[in-house]
């Protein structure tokens, strides 16, 4: 029994893999075909280690609940703070070791069964730590559907049945399990689906757990992590509290303080960001993720797409005044009317039926967007069709071969050493487990939509269509995410489809989007965690149980936190009625609300057809579909030209897909760091890169996050602030960058041309 292990004598957990590597040729067959994986993931396993222990459940559940509450709570504030699972990963290590040395070995037995577990089955091991981190990661991810609750209660000021809201939150999270189960063999077992972001976690786990002798002139991995963590932690007091402006340095604006055009060119937050950069890790990784975890070819493609869109297409459209671009701010997500003022939705919404009032709409104004926001939607259209075309051309044959091999009886021999170890040592998750979760989630989702007076507005056929979209796109989007660490979102396409089929109903639109696109995101999240478990040799059934329980717990906590805040904070999200010092401005939900206006109330039929302003954006569908074809043709014609194979059209189209939330300064900082580490250092100092790159990424994330939490609770929450000075403003000091430049348009704080 596991509980018989001696607590005082840690076992030697250095059991080598049973795979015998006889020579160089066999080593190539037995190891991963991906160099980064070979440099990071060990080909060893100890299947005797306990995993679902009392420590796993206790520390995992606490981490899940705390992170779900904290991230949901801070998400409503002016400066949202996201605490990543890396923080829990670090904190739970000493706690796990403390429990291993102090808890008794008493066994707990479940009454009426033969099941029992020990409070202390032995030394705290890496596999327990991995599952605790999975708990924490699930809690940190939040629940997207809570934004629907927020816009209903805080923006539209309508009631929503709490049972319907709870079912909405739970089912949107759980539907992804079905798609994960259907595609896990192709996205997990294949060694070519290598999930770059997981290598950061693998490196950190190894640094924290593997004993390493210090060699002369070299730091151990753990010591390196602790040094970088301390430096990152200490430094973040500067951009996080003492000098916030250092996060967005825009020198052009400081020189031309009265020129709107110069500030539009130089502003890193509201303009083109020429010459802007940030000396803050949260600026580098806050919106786009850590560039250290992204392979260089993906960075290069995204950078190329960003340059083409942001510095060629966008300026041409804006300064030629296409779509009356100069009438509106250069960089914003807000909708406008024909006079250049914010769009007033109360003038066109029937408050009784919660549908659009067409006579009122026709007498008021069509809806206008900033040219940046309009083109971002166009790129989203192109990204969808480019993804389909690219995966079909470049990966179609590969996926078909995987599909055929998955049905062979010799499945054990398929894949790399990690796949063979997992199949040899652990039982697979039965397919019916996934099907059962999918079926139960669908039935409850159907009840949430059709019951409760149909408050969600989404009919049964809308739910079926959302599920069909999720099923269709999970695999192609998963292939791209698993190989490039870049996610192709379907939010806009989901909004477009239901907006055409069921216009004028804002809640139906956001519910359809959530069931369609978020279930894909959840599926890929689950599959990504399965791949992490694959690398760390976690029993798949244990991984499934932890993910399922953590998802239900995190969704419940997120729902409870959201409902509590919406019920207890007066005028939450209403900046016109909140006190000036109130932090409850809900910045993320403002964008979500604006999207519900554009796609739900107005609808794409009045936006992207001849009835609206932007029918030209539909050309991006065709452009995106055709763009991969010449790349595929030349890659086949000139196979020796390796650089052609590295051109990735979906990544180019999605290079600016995080805009307008992310700004130019975030992109430039992200690209600069990524190119230095994953191009220059990877090629010139590969040994250092293999040893330290992913640990560096984890340490920078963790140090910044821990100091961010400390600053809030110790200083900001107690209203302890510094005297006002130039660098204490959370801005890039480019006040004119968001001014309209059309003649006669009046905007607060802006000159009238």
From Swiss-Prot:
Source organism: Arabidopsis thaliana (Mouse-ear cress)
Family statement: Belongs to the oligopeptide OPT transporter (TC 2.A.67.1) family.
Chain ranges passing through the membrane: 56-76, 80-100, 132-152, 163-183, 224-244, 296-316, 368-388, 432-452, 461-481, 506-528, 544-564, 583-603, 615-635, 662-682, 695-715
Keyword Protein transport set for record: yes
Location of the protein in the cell: Membrane
The protein's role, per its UniProt record: Involved in the translocation of tetra- and pentapeptides across the cellular membrane in an energy-dependent manner.
Record lineage: Eukaryota, Viridiplantae, Streptophyta, Embryophyta, Tracheophyta
Entry protein name: Oligopeptide transporter 5
Assigned keywords, A-Z: Membrane, Peptide transport, Protein transport, Transmembrane, Transmembrane helix, Transport
């Amino acid at each position: 029994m596991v509980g018989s292990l001696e607590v005082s004598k840690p076992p030697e957990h250095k059991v080598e893999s049973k795979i015998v590597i006889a020579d160089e040729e066999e080593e190539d067959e037995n190891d991963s075909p991906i160099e980064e994986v070979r440099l990071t993931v060990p080909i060893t396993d100890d299947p005797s280690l306990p995993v679902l222990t009392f420590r796993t459940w206790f520390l995992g559940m606490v981490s899940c609940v705390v992170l779900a509450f904290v991230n949901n709570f801070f998400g409503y504030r002016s400066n949202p703070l996201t605490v990543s699972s890396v923080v829990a990963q670090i904190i739970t290590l000493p706690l796990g070791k403390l429990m291993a040395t102090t808890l008794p070995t008493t066994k707990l037995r479940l009454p009426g069964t033969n099941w029992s577990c020990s409070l202390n089955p032995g030394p705290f091991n890496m596999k327990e730590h991995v599952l605790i981190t999975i708990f924490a990661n699930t809690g940190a991810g939040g629940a997207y559907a809570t934004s629907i609750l927020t816009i209903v209660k805080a923006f539209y000021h309508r009631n929503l049945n709490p049972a319907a809201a709870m079912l909405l939150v739970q089912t949107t999270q759980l539907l992804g399990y079905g798609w994960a189960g259907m595609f896990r063999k192709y996205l997990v077992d294949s060694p070519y689906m290598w999930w770059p972001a997981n290598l950061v976690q693998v490196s950190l786990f190894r640094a924290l757990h593997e004993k390493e002798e210090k060699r002369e002139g070299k730091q151990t991995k753990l010591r390196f992590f602790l040094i970088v963590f301390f430096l990152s932690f200490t430094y973040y007091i500067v951009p996080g509290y003492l000098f916030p402006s250092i996060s967005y340095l825009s020198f052009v604006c400081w020189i031309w303080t009265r020129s709107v055009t110069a500030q539009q060119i130089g502003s890193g937050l509201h303009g083109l960001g020429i010459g802007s950069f940030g000396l803050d890790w949260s600026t580098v990784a806050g919106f786009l993720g850590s560039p250290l975890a992204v392979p260089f070819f993906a960075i290069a493609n995204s950078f190329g797409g960003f340059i083409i869109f942001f510095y060629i297409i966008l300026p041409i459209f804006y300064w030629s005044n296409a779509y009356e671009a100069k009438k509106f701010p250069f960089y914003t997500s807000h909708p406008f009317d024909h006079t250049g003022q914010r769009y007033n939705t109360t003038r066109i919404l029937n408050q009784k039926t919660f549908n659009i009032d067409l006579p009122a709409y026709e007498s008021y104004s069509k809806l206008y967007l900033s040219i940046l926001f309009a083109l971002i939607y166009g790129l989203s259209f192109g990204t969808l069709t480019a993804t389909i075309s690219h995966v079909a051309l470049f990966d179609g044959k590969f996926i078909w071969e995987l599909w055929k091999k998955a049905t062979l009886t010799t499945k054990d021999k398929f894949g790399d050493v990690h796949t063979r170890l997992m199949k040899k040592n652990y039982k697979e998750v039965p397919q019916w487990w996934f099907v059962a979760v999918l079926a139960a989630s669908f039935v409850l989702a159907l009840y949430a939509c059709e019951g409760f007076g149909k408050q969600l507005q989404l009919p049964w056929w809308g739910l079926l269509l959302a599920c069909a979209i999720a099923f269709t796109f999970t695999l192609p989007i998963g292939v791209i995410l698993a190989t490039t660490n870049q996610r192709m979102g379907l939010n806009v396409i989901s909004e477009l489809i239901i907006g055409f089929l069921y216009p004028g109903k804002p809640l139906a639109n956001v519910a359809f989007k959530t069931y369609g696109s978020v279930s894909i995101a959840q599926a890929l999240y689950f599959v990504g965690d399965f791949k992490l478990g694959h690398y760390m040799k976690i029993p798949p059934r244990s991984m499934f149980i932890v993910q399922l329980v953590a998802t239900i717990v995190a969704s419940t906590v997120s729902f409870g936190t959201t409902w509590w805040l919406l019920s207890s904070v007066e005028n939450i999200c209403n900046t016109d009625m909140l006190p000036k010092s109130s932090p409850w401005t809900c910045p993320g939900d403002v964008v979500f609300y604006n999207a519900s206006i554009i796609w739900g109330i107005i609808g794409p039929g009045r936006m992207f057809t001849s009835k609206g302003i932007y029918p030209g954006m539909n050309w991006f569908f065709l452009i995106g579909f055709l763009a991969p074809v010449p790349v595929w043709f030349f890659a086949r014609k000139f196979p020796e030209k390796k650089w052609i194979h590295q051109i990735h059209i979906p990544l180019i189209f999605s290079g600016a897909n995080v805009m307008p939330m992310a700004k130019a300064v975030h992109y430039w900082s992200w690209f600069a760091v990524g190119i230095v580490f994953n191009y220059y250092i990877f090629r010139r100092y590969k040994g250092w890169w293999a040893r330290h790159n992913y640990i560096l990424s984890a340490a920078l994330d963790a140090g910044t996050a821990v100091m961010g939490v400390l600053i809030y609770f110790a200083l900001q929450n107690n209203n302890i602030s510094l005297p006002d000075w130039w660098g204490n403003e959370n801005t890039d000091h480019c006040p004119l960058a968001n001014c309209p430049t059309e003649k006669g348009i009046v905007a607060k704080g802006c000159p009238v041309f």
